[in-house]
């Protein structure tokens, strides 16, 4: 089990075409439900979930776990890709702060590569939606303060000017407005 939700993954298969999708069944609690609601309302990413009594069913978010991405994929990225990842990390950091989404260590988010004609675009999404809105320390809600995310923070300092960081923060906030 992981944490206090005791999750398990189920695979639902369409018998007509053999397509399938994964869902997670977890013990429901208020902080997790609030986190999912905020994700759905305040993020450009929508997530499907269902709550029944003390059970939560949450759709699987596909991607490469952040800790694995940092170890295995990041060293192989081009400078253009690193620049894109830095931009996405700034936006992800902003979204976590806005949604009071705490504990975004690298194993609590995924990096989603999308292949285009001549390059790969990247997005970063949370996969653990526990809220810590009772915490008075703002650092809890900012992924760049966690040591596991230092390689991502280094990308930001190496590839982005302060003016670009501010621009990306404003871009992300404008999606909520």
Region locations from a protein language model:
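Glycine-rich loops and low-complexity Gly/Arg-rich segments
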Residues: 49-51, 72-73, 82-83, 149-154
């Amino acid at each position: 089990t992981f944490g206090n939700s005791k999750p398990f993954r189920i695979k639902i298969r369409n018998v007509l075409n053999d397509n399938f999708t994964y869902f997670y069944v977890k013990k429901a609690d208020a902080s997790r439900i609030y986190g999912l609601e905020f994700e759905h309302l305040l993020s450009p990413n929508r997530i499907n979930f269902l709550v029944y009594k003390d059970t939560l069913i949450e759709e699987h978010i596909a991607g490469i776990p952040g800790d694995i991405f940092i170890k295995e994929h990041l060293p192989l990225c081009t400078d253009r890709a690193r620049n894109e990842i830095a931009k996405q990390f700034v936006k992800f950091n902003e979204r976590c702060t806005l949604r009071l989404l705490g504990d975004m260590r690298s194993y609590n988010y995924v990096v989603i590569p999308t292949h285009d004609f001549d390059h790969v675009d990247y997005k970063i999404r949370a996969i653990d939606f526990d809220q810590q809105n009772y915490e008075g320390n703002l650092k809890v809600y900012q992924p760049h303060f966690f040591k596991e995310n230092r390689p991502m923070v280094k990308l930001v300092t190496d590839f982005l000017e302060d003016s670009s960081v501010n621009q990306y923060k404003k871009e992300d906030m404008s999606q909520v407005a």
